[in-house]
Amino acid sequence: MAAEPPADGRDPPADDGAAGDGAVESAAAEALLSAASEQLTLVYQGEVYVFDPVPPQKVQAVLLVLGGSDMPPGLVSMAVPTTFDEKSTTVAARRIASLMRFREKRKERCFDKKIRYSVRKEVAQKMKRRKGQFAGRADFGDGSCSSAPCGSTANGEDDHIRETHCQNCGISSRLTPAMRRGPAGPRSLCNACGLMWANKGTLRSPLNAPKMTVQHPADLSKTGDTDDSKANLCAEHNQTTMKTDTEMVPEQEQKADVLPPTKEEDSMATS
């Protein structure tokens, strides 16, 4: 027979097993609710255990170790936005800080051209020149000159004073394009000997060197006088030839006027 319900209308007391399951479920619910506020509260056999603070990840790990199920999706959705918000705020703060540092560095930068051409022009005018090109200290010593004209006059004097000769063939530095390095040091060989020494490592025989002499100003004046005298002689010779030509022209014209007699004139003369 089925058991009749009590007269007061109350439900009969549940079994011990059903009561135990209800207690476990209530304890788990309380633990989850407290975990949402980062405070874990456990009720076991009438005793309450409170752990503060405990993150939701640790609660889920404990439930997995105890053999329970994963955390409810509602609790996870409640906990994830907080962490996402923290990450977004940290990223935004870092970006703002880096942007501020970049702006501070940009203020210190200067993109203007700092080339001062006037200063460069003054330096170029003070530098020594040789044949229109910049020359080093080795060519002119340690002396300094403050202007380009002064440098040009000094160059002429130095070229006249520091005339050197090739140590191999004896040719002057004025008769070669450039003096080159040799076994005795720089500017010790002429252009031809220096090139042969640089390419083949040997010196050419002095017999093959061209014999060229330097013409001094006095010699140049003498040669100029001789050239003038030759030019005068040529002019006089041309004038005499022109005179002879003019004198010979009338005689040729007279000869041209005298023509040989024709056959008719000869026949009339004979008759």
Swiss-Prot record:
It comes from Oryza sativa subsp. indica (Rice). The keyword Metal-binding applies. The keyword Transcription regulation applies. SUPFAM superfamilies: Glucocorticoid receptor-like (DNA-binding domain). Transcriptional activator that specifically binds 5'-GATA-3' or 5'-GAT-3' motifs within gene promoters. GO terms for biological process: regulation of DNA-templated transcription. It is found in: Nucleus. Residues 33-68 form the Tify domain. InterPro entries: CCT_domain, TIFY-like, Tify_dom, Znf_GATA, Znf_NHR/GATA. Its main location: nucleus. The gene is GATA19. Keywords: Activator, DNA-binding, Metal-binding, Nucleus, Transcription, Transcription regulation, Zinc, Zinc-finger. GO terms for molecular function: sequence-specific DNA binding; zinc ion binding. This is GATA transcription factor 19.
